[in-house]
Amino acid sequence: GHQQNPTTGYNIKGDPAGKIDLESLCKAMGIADVRVCDPYDLQKTEETVKAALSFSGPSVVISRRPCALLKYVKHQPAFSVDQTKCVGCKSCMRIGCPAISMKNGKAQVDETLCVGCGVCEQLCGVKAFVHH
């Protein structure tokens, strides 16, 4: 992440460049099962990966989402943790998000690092994560 790749239409310097259609490339290589998912949607991503794993031949899963670290990517509002709801189960820590840490046994969000992706909200069983 954090740099251009052949599917973005820009080179490593950020200048316009040829763009590769990754799905077409995979199909041209003989991959019959090519699936695309948004990695911010955990349920659909899990369903996509399970379907690909159950396919009888080679399968490709393309996770498509602009890198959150690129300057031109627009972010959603940051999340925060309702400390009265957080039970300290650490489910949110499974994603390794740099914005989430534990303090006094409960999750907290560094709003300067949060890109508002909502993955933490999807993982939290007690709905302690809230948008601003």
List each language-model region with its residue ranges.
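Glycine/aspartate-rich loop-and-adjacent alpha/beta segment that forms the canonical ThDP
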Residues: 51-102
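Active-site-proximal structural scaffolding
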Residues: 15-19, 30, 38, 54, ...
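Fold-independent oxyanion-binding glycine-rich loops
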Residues: 37-40, 63-66, 83-84, 111-112, ...
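Residue-level preference for nonpolar/small residues embedded in alpha-helices
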Residues: 17-21, 44, 78, 106, ...
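Thiamine diphosphate
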Residues: 1-60, 73
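Short, contiguous acidic/charged loop-to-helix segments that flank catalytic cores in large enzymes
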Residues: 10-14, 77, 82-87, 111-115
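Iron-sulfur cluster-binding cysteine motifs and their immediate structural context
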Residues: 87-108, 115, 119-132
